[in-house]
Design a protein with these regions (language model features):
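N-terminal secretory signal peptides and thylakoid transit peptides that target proteins
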Residues: 1-15, 19
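Secondary-structure junction/capping motif
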Residues: 4, 25, 253-254
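Short, low-complexity, disordered segments immediately C-terminal to signal peptides
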Residues: 21-42
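C-terminal domain-boundary segment and adjacent tail
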Residues: 35-37, 42-44, 48-49, 57-71, ...
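Short charge-dense sequence patches
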Residues: 39-44, 64-69, 96-109, 160-168, ...
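Active-site beta->alpha N-cap acidic-glycine motif
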Residues: 48-141, 145-149, 156
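Catalytic domains of cell-wall/extracellular-matrix polysaccharide-remodeling enzymes
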Residues: 90, 136-265
Length: 265
C-alpha cells in the first residue's frame, strides 16, 4: 500500500475514534447531571388545604402529647363525642352553666347524624377535633384502613364546621402506634393528643367514682379523657369543676393549653 494511502487511513481512524470518545463523554456527563423527577413515597394528598387548622402539609409523622405545660395552672377537659345526643346536650348545658370551655373529639359518623348539636357546640365556643369516622379498634386495621378512618372524619368535620380540626385522637388505644402517627401526620395532623388522666368512665363506675378518679390525678397541664355517652360522666362534671376551681386550675380549650411546650406522661 502506498505511504500516502496508509497515512490517509490512519488519520481517518484516529478521527472516528476521537468522535466516539467525545460522544460517550457527553452521554456520561448528561446522565450524571440531568435532574430526574423524584418518585413520591406516598400518594400525594391535599392535607393542609382542607380545614383551617390542618397545618402539617409535609406529611411527617405526627407527635403524641399526653399533657400540657406543668408550669401553668390550666387543664383541658376532653370528651370522646359519640352516642346518645341527649347526653351530649346535658354535657353542653353543664358546661354552659359553669362557663367553661371543653374540647370534643368527635366520631365523624356522629357529626353527620347530629348537625344541630354540632352547631351548638361551635356557638358555645367549644373545640371540635378528629376521633375517627366510625370508632374502630385502630390497632387491628391496615394502613389504608387507618388512613380512611382519619380522612373521612376530617372530611365530616370540614363539611360541618369549615375546619378539619387541629388534633387527632385514635380510637381503641391509649398510646398511638407508629402506623397511626404516620397516617395522622400524612392526613394533616401534626399532633396526636393522648391524656394523663383517665378515669375509665366508659366502664360505668358511677359519677362518684369518675369524679374521684379525675380529681385524684388532676394537676396543672392535665388532659382529662372523658366520654359523652355515659350518664355518670355527665353527672361527675360539676364536682370535677368545683374541685378544679378550689385548686386554682382553669379549664381551657386544648389549643390554648398546648400553645406552650407539651410534656410527656
Amino acid at each position: 500500500m502506498a505511504p500516502s494511502r496508509r497515512a490517509f487511513l490512519a488519520a481517518a481512524a484516529a478521527t472516528m475514534a476521537a468522535a466516539c470518545s467525545n460522544q460517550a463523554t457527553r452521554s456520561d456527563a448528561s446522565a450524571s447531571t440531568t435532574p430526574t423527577r423524584p418518585v413520591p413515597s406516598t400518594t400525594p394528598t391535599t392535607a393542609g388545604r382542607v380545614g383551617a387548622h390542618a397545618t402539617n402539609v409535609n406529611g411527617k409523622p405526627a407527635k403524641v402529647v399526653f399533657a400540657g405545660p406543668r408550669t401553668r395552672r390550666q387543664v383541658a377537659l376532653t370528651f370522646h363525642l359519640s352516642g346518645d345526643p341527649a347526653l351530649a346536650s346535658r354535657l353542653l348545658d353543664t358546661a354552659a352553666q359553669a362557663g367553661v370551655p371543653i374540647s370534643l373529639f368527635a366520631v365523624g359518623r356522629w357529626l353527620a347524624e347530629h348537625p344541630a348539636l354540632v352547631q351548638r357546640i361551635l356557638a358555645d365556643g367549644h373545640e371540635l377535633d378528629n376521633h375517627t369516622w366510625s370508632h374502630p379498634m385502630l390497632g387491628r386495621l391496615s394502613g389504608p384502613a387507618v388512613a380512611a378512618e382519619i380522612r373521612r372524619c376530617k372530611a365530616a368535620l370540614t363539611q360541618a364546621t369549615g375546619s378539619g380540626g387541629r388534633y387527632f385522637r385514635p380510637s381503641g388505644m391509649t398510646r398511638p402506634t407508629p402506623l397511626v402517627l404516620a397516617e395522622a401526620g400524612a392526613a394533616g395532623y401534626p399532633l396526636v393528643v393522648a391524656y394523663d388522666v383517665d378515669p375509665r368512665d366508659y366502664t360505668d363506675p358511677g359519677a362518684d367514682a369518675v369524679a374521684a378518679r379525675v380529681t385524684a390525678r388532676l394537676r396543672p397541664g392535665s388532659i382529662v379523657s372523658l366520654h359523652t355517652s355515659h350518664t355518670g360522666t355527665i353527672t361527675a362534671l360539676a364536682p370535677v369543676l368545683t374541685t378544679a376551681r378550689v385548686r386554682g386550675l382553669q379549664p381551657v380549650r386544648l389549643h390554648r393549653l398546648l400553645d406552650g411546650r407539651p410534656s410527656g406522661p
